[in-house]
Amino acid sequence: MLTIGVLALGVSDVERATAFWRGALGYDVRTDGFGGWSTVLVPPGGSGTMIALQRSETPPRDHPRLHLDLHVENAAEQEAEAQRLVALGAERVDWDSYPDDPDFVVLADPDGNRFCIVDLGHDYG
């Protein structure tokens, strides 16, 4: 049976991306021994999906084929986390594909990689 072990994100500045994603998720650095080319972050306690931040010259896309969904319990937590991540260096994205009454907000990390904060308690009325 396959499991997801590592999700790799392309970034232009590995050190900056490491600081952002460590602050965002509270992950620990497992290794940065790749000469500035890559860093692997692990969840606290070491169990769960890791994130590899790998240097890339490819620009991010406005509609990426793969992105992270970060989950929160309610709308208040969603807004608080969005504000916290913006303070860490993320940007809110004025996305052209929001549905009516979305349960998510779209942000971009300092490299422009888009991700969502999803409200798991969203009332679809």
Language-model segments: which ranges?
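Vicinal oxygen chelate
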Residues: 13-14, 68-111
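Core segments of cupin and vicinal oxygen chelate
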Residues: 2, 8-50
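Short, solvent-exposed beta-strand edge segments and adjacent coil->beta transition regions
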Residues: 2-6, 63-67
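Active-site beta-strand termini and strand-to-loop segments that position acidic
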Residues: 41-46, 107-110, 120
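Conserved beta-strand in the GNAT
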Residues: 49-54, 106, 115-118
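Short, glycine-anchored, charge-dense loop/turn motifs used at functional sites
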Residues: 21, 111-115
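A short acidic/small-residue loop/turn micro-motif
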Residues: 100, 121-124
